[in-house]
């Protein structure tokens, strides 16, 4: 008897729960004993995509649809009233909505705790599957994921999910008042994920006293966006800036990731001098970006903050309203050549307890307002914002070996007074200056001088495969001559 076959039924059923339900059902071919194990599998995942293969000889679409629905019926019938933990249903081929109602009702009656639904009946909003009110009346549901093609715009005050802790809404339509009704029905909610939600109103408020984690990933254009979430500890926000942020109550927030989206046209407008006669065209963008300062003020208690390159550019219009981040210990910033650092000086000055700074990409757009955080523009107060920043650990990612980057690194070493460690990670995407003949050796030698001259410990991090490539093409020195204490290879 093989080792797997000797395991008890309960453990085998648990193992099968990690497979798709179709894969679990196929194990019935192994032996008679395996035939009925699927009846006790606590996790079911039905996805019609496993029935849709383009190979020659596959049945027509109607036959595939019927085969899929019959398969779900058989598995649920075989399980009868056995307990169920997770139920995932993903349908893209227009299944019978009445049968979907029956499947969802079946697992709800059996006390399902996690429900994941994606049901596409057609291509228009009118074709959306209307989730039954029973889906919002469960006393056992802990996690609910509602995906594309499902209509929940009917939500009424009679719904109540007392145990629900996680709600994920992906590509659904929503009126704001219905959304607020839904949140009121979730007294235990701790995690909310909103992905590409299509708001049918322009002013949105997220209000929930128990919410701890909020993730927003969209590309909409809202009028106002308010947050009344006093218990929130994690906030990830990726979207175009709203027109205004009237209320941002996040006093217990500990970690925030702000990835605002902007267009090149918007960036071009805000960089133009006001006296260019384009005030009317600029007013809306300038005002909207300026209101992002209210959002930043609402998250001022964070301990960890991550900003995208677009966000950093937007913050150039919020310098006067930038709050003091008195609790901030770690700051991560992504930089690109097309976006500026105008906000970097005030940001660093307003982090009085910053310990760790990560910059992904040192190259950025240079302007006459570039500030003193870099050495792009000669200034009398060069490095002033750095000298007041207590950061002791600096990580630089995406290093490409350019002269400008080397100047920036020396600038940081010169002006960060408390810097104890600097780790520089070589860029692995695409060709870089590091691959030029002799350049890798020159850079490592220069970093060696930095490491010896400054009190800061400088280390150059290179992934193993890239390290072999760079050392293999160097003809003027042997690999054993590299300063191994300085250059560290990564797995």
Swiss-Prot record:
Pfam families: F-box (PF00646), LRR_At5g56370 (PF24758)
Keyword ATP-binding: no
Subcellular location: Nucleus
A GO term from the CC aspect: nucleus
GO biological process terms, semicolon-separated: protein ubiquitination
InterPro entries linked: F-box-like_dom_sf, F-box_AtFBL13-like, F-box_dom, FBD, FBL60-like, LRR_dom_sf, LRR_FXL15/At3g58940/PEG3-like
Gene3D superfamilies hit by this protein: 1.20.1280.50, Ribonuclease Inhibitor (3.80.10.10)
Metabolic or biological pathway, per its Swiss-Prot or TrEMBL entry: Protein modification; protein ubiquitination
Every F-box domain range: 1-49
UniProtKB keywords: Nucleus, Ubl conjugation pathway
Superkingdom of the source species: Eukaryota
PANTHER family for the chain: RNI-LIKE SUPERFAMILY PROTEIN (PTHR31293:SF16)
Self-association state and partner proteins as the record states: Part of a SCF (ASK-cullin-F-box) protein ligase complex. Interacts with ASK4.
Function: Component of SCF(ASK-cullin-F-box) E3 ubiquitin ligase complexes, which may mediate the ubiquitination and subsequent proteasomal degradation of target proteins.
Domain characteristics, as noted in the entry: The F-box is necessary for the interaction with ASK proteins.
Name this polypeptide is given: F-box protein At3g59000
Organism annotation: Arabidopsis thaliana (Mouse-ear cress)
């Amino acid at each position: 008897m093989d080792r797997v076959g000797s395991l008890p039924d309960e453990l085998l059923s648990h193992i099968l729960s990690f497979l798709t339900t179709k894969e679990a059902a196929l194990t019935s071919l192994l032996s008679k004993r395996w035939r009925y194990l699927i009846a006790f599998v606590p996790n079911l995942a039905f996805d019609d995509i496993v029935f849709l293969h383009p190979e020659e000889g596959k049945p027509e679409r109607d036959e595939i649809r019927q085969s899929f629905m019959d398969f779900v019926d058989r598995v649920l019938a075989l399980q009868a009233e056995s307990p169920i933990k997770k139920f995932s249903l993903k349908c893209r081929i227009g299944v019978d909505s009445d049968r979907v109602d029956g499947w969802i009702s079946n697992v709800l009656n059996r006390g399902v705790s996690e429900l994941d639904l994606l049901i596409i009946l057609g291509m228009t909003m009118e074709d959306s599957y209307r989730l039954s009110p029973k889906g919002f009346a469960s006393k056992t549901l802990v996690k609910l994921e509602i995906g594309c093609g499902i209509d929940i715009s009917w939500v009424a005050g009679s719904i109540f999910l007392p145990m629900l802790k996680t709600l994920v809404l992906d590509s659904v339509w929503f009126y704001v008042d219905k959304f607020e009704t839904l949140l009121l029905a979730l007294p235990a909610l701790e995690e909310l994920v909103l992905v590409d939600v299509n708001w049918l109103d322009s002013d949105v408020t997220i209000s929930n006293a128990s919410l701890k984690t909020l993730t927003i990933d969209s590309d909409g254009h809202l009028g106002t966006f308010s947050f009344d979430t006093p218990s929130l500890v994690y906030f990830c926000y990726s979207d175009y800036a709203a027109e205004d942020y009237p209320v941002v109550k996040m006093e217990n927030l500990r970690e925030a990731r702000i990835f605002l989206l902007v267009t090149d046209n918007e960036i071009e407008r805000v960089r133009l001098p006001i006296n260019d006669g384009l005030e009317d065209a600029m007013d809306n963008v300038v005002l909207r970006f300026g209101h992002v300062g209210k959002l930043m003020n609402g998250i001022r208690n964070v301990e960890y903050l991550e900003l995208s390159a677009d966000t950093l550019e937007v913050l150039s219009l919020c310098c006067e309203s930038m709050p003091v981040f008195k609790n901030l210990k770690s700051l991560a910033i992504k930089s690109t050549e097309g976006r500026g650092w105008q906000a970097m000086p005030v940001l660093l000055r307003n982090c009085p307890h910053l310990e760790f700074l990560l910059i992904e990409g040192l190259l950025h757009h240079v302007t006459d307002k570039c500030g003193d955080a870099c050495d792009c523009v000669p200034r009398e107060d060069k490095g002033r914002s750095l000298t007041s920043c207590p950061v002791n650990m600096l990580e630089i990612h995406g290093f490409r070996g350019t002269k400008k980057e080397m100047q920036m690194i020396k600038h940081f070493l010169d002006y960060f007074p408390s810097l104890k460690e600097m780790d520089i990670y070589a860029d692995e995407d695409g060709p870089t200056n590091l691959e030029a003949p002799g350049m890798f050796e020159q850079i490592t030698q220069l970093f060696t001088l930095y490491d010896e001259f400054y009190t800061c410990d400088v280390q150059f991090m290179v992934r193993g495969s890239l390290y072999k490539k760079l050392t293999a093409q160097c003809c003027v020195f042997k690999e054993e001559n590299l300063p191994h204490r300085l250059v560290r290879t990564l797995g």
